[in-house]
C-alpha cells in the first residue's frame, strides 16, 4: 500500500505561491467593478479638489473691506450652482461647500457676522478667511492617487470616483475554471435517481471564489473515465490560469483524474 506524507496548509500555500507567475497583461475596467483589483498603471487626479475656493462653513461673503456695512442680498449662494455678476456692494449668504466667486475673497462665518436691519456691519463682524477651503486643498491636480501594483480597496475606489475616474487600468484577472468529477454526480437543479449524488462542492467553491476579482467559469461535471478526463484537460488547460477539480482525486486504481495528472503534469505536493 502506498503511503503519502501530509503537509500543512501553510506549506501548501507557500509552494503554490512560489510557483505562481505575476501576470503582465493589462485591461481596462469600469471603476464600479474594480474592487480588490490590482492597478497596472499609476493613476493621478485629473482635477483639483475642490476645483474652486469654497465655503468651509455657512456664512457670508463680501468683495472687499472698503465699506463699513453691506446690504445683505436675498440671493443665497448654494452648492452645485455657479453664480456670476454678483454686486460687489452686497453681502451674500453662502452655504457650506458652495463655490466662492473669484471676486469675493472675504468670508465671515454665521457666528462672526453681525446683521442689523438687513445689513452686515463690518466693524462688528469678524472676517475669517481661514474658513475658506482653498482650490486643491484636498487633492492637487496630477497628484498620485493610486500607485502601480496597488490594490483597489473600497476607500481607493471612492477616492477615484470623487475625481470622476470612470475607467481604470488593472492587471487582467486570473481565469479560473471549476469542475466536479464523478460518475455518481448530478447537477442540483436536476431530478436525481437513488444511486446519484447532488453536486454541492462545485457550487460552494464557485460562490466562495466570487469575493475575489477573478474571471470564473463553471466547467460542469466530468465523468470519471480516462478518455474524458484526458480530453477535458487537454482542451481546457491552455484556456485557464487555474482549474479547480472537486472529486475524482483519490489514489485508488479507478481514479482517472489523479492518474492523468500524475502522468502529464508536475505534482508539487501530495495530500
Question: PLM features: residue spans?
Answer:
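Phosphate-interaction motifs
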Residues: 2-165
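Short glycine-rich anion-binding loops that position phosphate/pyrophosphate groups of nucleotides
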Residues: 67, 97-99, 183-184, 247-254
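N-terminal small/polar loop signature for handling phosphorylated ligands or for N-terminal nucleophile
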Residues: 76-88, 92-93, 105-107, 206-262
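Short beta-strand segments
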Residues: 93-95, 147, 178-181, 245-246
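Short glycine/serine/threonine-rich phosphate/pyrophosphate-binding segments
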Residues: 102-104, 154-155, 187-188, 251-255
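Short, glycine/charged-enriched secondary-structure capping and boundary segments
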Residues: 107-110, 161, 191-194, 257-261
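Glycine-rich phosphate/diphosphate-binding loop of Rossmann-like nucleotide-binding domains
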Residues: 163-231, 236
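Glycine-rich phosphate/nucleotide-binding loop
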Residues: 259-271
Amino acid at each position: 500500500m502506498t503511503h503519502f506524507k501530509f503537509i500543512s496548509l501553510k506549506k501548501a500555500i507557500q509552494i503554490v505561491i512560489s510557483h505562481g507567475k505575476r501576470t503582465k497583461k493589462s485591461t481596462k475596467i469600469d471603476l464600479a467593478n474594480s474592487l480588490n483589483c490590482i492597478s497596472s498603471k499609476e493613476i493621478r487626479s485629473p482635477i483639483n479638489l475642490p476645483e474652486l475656493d469654497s465655503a468651509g462653513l455657512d456664512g457670508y461673503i463680501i468683495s472687499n473691506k472698503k465699506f463699513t456695512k453691506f446690504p445683505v442680498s436675498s440671493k443665497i449662494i448654494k452648492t452645485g450652482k455657479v453664480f456670476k455678476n454678483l454686486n460687489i456692494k452686497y453681502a451674500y449668504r453662502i452655504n457650506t461647500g458652495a463655490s466662492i466667486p473669484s471676486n469675493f475673497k472675504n468670508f465671515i462665518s454665521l457666528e462672526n457676522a453681525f446683521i442689523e436691519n438687513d445689513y452686515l456691519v463690518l466693524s462688528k463682524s469678524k472676517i475669517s478667511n481661514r474658513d475658506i477651503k482653498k482650490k486643491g486643498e484636498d487633492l492637487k491636480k496630477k497628484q498620485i492617487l493610486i500607485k502601480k501594483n496597488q490594490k483597489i480597496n473600497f476607500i481607493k475606489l471612492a477616492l477615484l470616483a470623487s475625481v470622476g475616474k470612470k475607467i481604470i487600468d488593472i492587471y487582467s484577472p486570473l481565469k479560473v475554471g471549476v469542475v466536479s468529477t464523478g460518475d455518481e454526480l448530478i447537477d442540483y437543479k436536476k431530478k436525481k435517481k437513488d444511486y446519484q449524488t447532488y453536486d454541492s462542492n462545485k457550487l460552494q467553491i464557485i460562490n466562495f471564489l466570487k469575493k475575489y476579482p477573478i474571471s470564473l467559469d463553471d466547467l460542469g461535471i466530468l465523468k470519471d473515465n480516462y478518455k474524458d478526463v484526458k480530453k477535458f484537460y487537454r482542451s481546457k488547460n491552455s484556456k485557464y490560469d487555474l482549474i479547480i477539480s472537486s472529486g475524482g482525486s483519490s489514489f485508488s486504481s479507478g481514479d482517472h483524474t489523479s492518474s492523468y495528472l500524475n502522468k502529464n503534469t508536475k505534482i508539487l505536493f501530495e495530500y
